[in-house]
Amino acid sequence: MNQRLVYVVSDSGGETAELVVRAAASQFYNSHIQLKRVPYVEDKTMLAEVVALAKMNQAIIAFTLVVPEMRQFLIEEAAREGVVAYDIIGPLIEKMSDLFKLTPRYEPGQVRVLDEDYFKKIEAIEFAVKYDDGRDPRGILRADIVLIGVSRTSKTPLSQYLAHKRLKVANVPIVPEVEPPEQLFKVPPEKCFGLKISPEKLLSIRRERLKSLGLNDQAIYANMDRIKEELAYFDGIVKKIGCDVIDVTNKAVEETANIIMKKRRL
């Protein structure tokens, strides 16, 4: 077999099927399994074409088709052509229907239905992008949470993680040469969190960052005296605000986010 190929077929976007297939493929070390997504399948002609391609390429078909007629056609067509076709969602729908005495809607794309919760998440993500890295201080007073810290303390990834929890987050870099925006000192202290890190850890992170950019890792940005100066300035700012400080030295973003949400009781 020249290639290991899986056609991911769906009558919706195919994200669900692809996630399952990728999870399965991850169990095979250095397998180099290739996925080809075939989304929004609406007719049997397209299904027949996929079966023909799968036969020609000795591939597997993994599919999420919720319409029974389409699902049955693919199963029968694949069997007729000797192609392996795996139904990801059909058997589970049937088991749920039988056990819970429920009637399925058989409507594609229900996972992607745009509801209020979805819009809140999108709004929070857009907010985090717009008010990232102190770009626009007007967002500080509109935010649910404000993060402050020196460079490379995971402010941006933490903002994005919290945004996926539907929280509007603004973050502000603390730099000795730049006076923090006045809005920062008007934020209720309980909404603001300072991100603290050990000088040694920060030095290591910054040097790796410079190397990844192809720059000299001995630049002032990765100088211990400079780092200590920045952290001392940061300490003064958080004391002035009166906000909580979280040591992120050895914490994953998820762990820091959980601490913040617990403190805010979110």
UniProtKB/Swiss-Prot annotation:
<dbReference type="Pfam" id="PF03618">
    <property type="entry name" value="Kinase-PPPase"/>
</dbReference>
<keyword id="KW-0547">Nucleotide-binding</keyword>
<keyword id="KW-0808">Transferase</keyword>
<dbReference type="GO" id="GO:0016776">
    <property type="term" value="F:phosphotransferase activity, phosphate group as acceptor"/>
</dbReference>
<dbReference type="GO" id="GO:0005524">
    <property type="term" value="F:ATP binding"/>
</dbReference>
<protein>
    <recommendedName>
        <fullName>Putative pyruvate, phosphate dikinase regulatory protein</fullName>
        <ecNumber>2.7.11.32</ecNumber>
        <ecNumber>2.7.4.27</ecNumber>
    </recommendedName>
</protein>
<dbReference type="GO" id="GO:0043531">
    <property type="term" value="F:ADP binding"/>
</dbReference>
<dbReference type="InterPro" id="IPR026565">
    <property type="entry name" value="PPDK_reg"/>
</dbReference>
<feature type="binding site">
    <location>
        <begin position="149"/>
        <end position="156"/>
    </location>
    <ligand>
        <name>ADP</name>
    </ligand>
</feature>
<keyword id="KW-0723">Serine/threonine-protein kinase</keyword>
<comment type="similarity">
    <text>Belongs to the pyruvate, phosphate/water dikinase regulatory protein family. PDRP subfamily.</text>
</comment>
<comment type="function">
    <text>Bifunctional serine/threonine kinase and phosphorylase involved in the regulation of the pyruvate, phosphate dikinase (PPDK) by catalyzing its phosphorylation/dephosphorylation.</text>
</comment>
<keyword id="KW-0418">Kinase</keyword>
<dbReference type="GO" id="GO:0004674">
    <property type="term" value="F:protein serine/threonine kinase activity"/>
</dbReference>
<dbReference type="InterPro" id="IPR005177">
    <property type="entry name" value="Kinase-pyrophosphorylase"/>
</dbReference>
